[in-house]
Amino acid sequence: MEHTTTHNNDPLVLGGRALESRLFIGTGKYGSDSLIPRVAEASGAQVITVALRRVDMQAAAGNVMQHIPQHMQLLPNTSGARTAEEAVRIARLARAAGCGDWIKIEVISDSRYLLPDGYETAKATEILARDGFVVLPYMNPDLYVARDLVSAGAAAVMPLGAPIGTNRGLRTQEMIGILIEEIELPVIVDAGIGRPSQACEAMEMGAAACLVNTAIASAGDPVLMASAFGAAVRAGRRAWLAGTGAVLEGQAQASSPLLGFLDS
C-alpha cells in the first residue's frame, strides 16, 4: 500500500471535522475529575468520551462536564445500555442536553466480560445514523459485524483490543488487521490498550486512531502517561505513513558491503 500523505497534512476527518490528533481519551476512573483538563492538554487529544450516566446537567458542582475543555469534541457514550432501544434513548437524551450529534454506541448485556452485542449495536447504529448522528460503535473485531455497521451508516468502527479496562493490549491484533484491510471506514482501536507501545503498534498497523482511558487514568502519573500516549500515537502514525521496511526471513542481510573495501 502506498502512503502519499505527509504527517504535516494528515487529518482524521470524522463528522465533517478534521482532527489533527489521533488519540481519543476518556473521563472515567480518575482519582479526581480535576485531572481531566491537565490530561487533555498533555495528551494533545481533541476528542473526549463521557458516559451520559455520569453527567448531571442540573448540578452546579461535581459535574464531570465542568472539567472538559471547551475546545474538545465531546463524544458521549451509551454505557449502561443493554439493548438498541436503550442506546437510542441515551443518545437522544445526550443530544437534547446539548452534547451534540457525536455518539459512541456501547450496547453490552454481558456484565462479566463487557463484550458488545453486535446485533443490537448495528440496530442502534442504523436508527441513529438516520437521525443525523455521527455514530462510532464499539464492537468485537469481527469482519461481518463491521460490514453490518458500515451498511448501517457508522462513521467509523471501534474494535476492542482486549476487554474493557484490562490493560492487556492488542489481544485481537490479527482481527483488527483484517478490519483495517477490508473496511472502508476509519478503524479506531478502543478498549484494552495498556501501554503507549501498544498504541504505537496499533497505529503502525494502520489504525486511524486509538481511544485510551484506563491506561492513563490508572497510571501513577496520569498527566505524564497522557503525554506518553500522545507521542506514541503520533510516532505510530508517522511510521505507517513512512512505510515500514520489509521483514526478511532466513539469513541476515548486511546494511553495508562486507567485502572489497580493504582491496581498494
UniProtKB/Swiss-Prot annotation:
Pathway: Cofactor biosynthesis; thiamine diphosphate biosynthesis. Its EC number is 2.8.1.10. One of its GO terms (biological process) is thiamine diphosphate biosynthetic process. Keywords: Cytoplasm, Schiff base, Thiamine biosynthesis, Transferase. InterPro entries: Aldolase_TIM (IPR013785), Thiazole_synthase_ThiG (IPR033983), ThiG (IPR008867). 1-deoxy-D-xylulose 5-phosphate binds at G165, A191, G192, N213, T214. It catalyses: [ThiS sulfur-carrier protein]-C-terminal-Gly-aminoethanethioate + 2-iminoacetate + 1-deoxy-D-xylulose 5-phosphate = [ThiS sulfur-carrier protein]-C-terminal Gly-Gly + 2-[(2R,5Z)-2-carboxy-4-methylthiazol-5(2H)-ylidene]ethyl phosphate + 2 H2O + H(+). One of its GO terms (cellular component) is cytoplasm. CDD domains: ThiG. GO terms for molecular function: thiazole synthase activity. The active site is at K104. It is found in: Cytoplasm. It comes from the Bacteria. Belongs to the ThiG family. HAMAP family: ThiG. Catalyzes the rearrangement of 1-deoxy-D-xylulose 5-phosphate (DXP) to produce the thiazole phosphate moiety of thiamine. Sulfur is provided by the thiocarboxylate moiety of the carrier protein ThiS. In vitro, sulfur can be provided by H(2)S. Homotetramer. Forms heterodimers with either ThiH or ThiS. This is Thiazole synthase. It comes from Oleidesulfovibrio alaskensis (strain ATCC BAA-1058 / DSM 17464 / G20) (Desulfovibrio alaskensis). The gene is thiG.
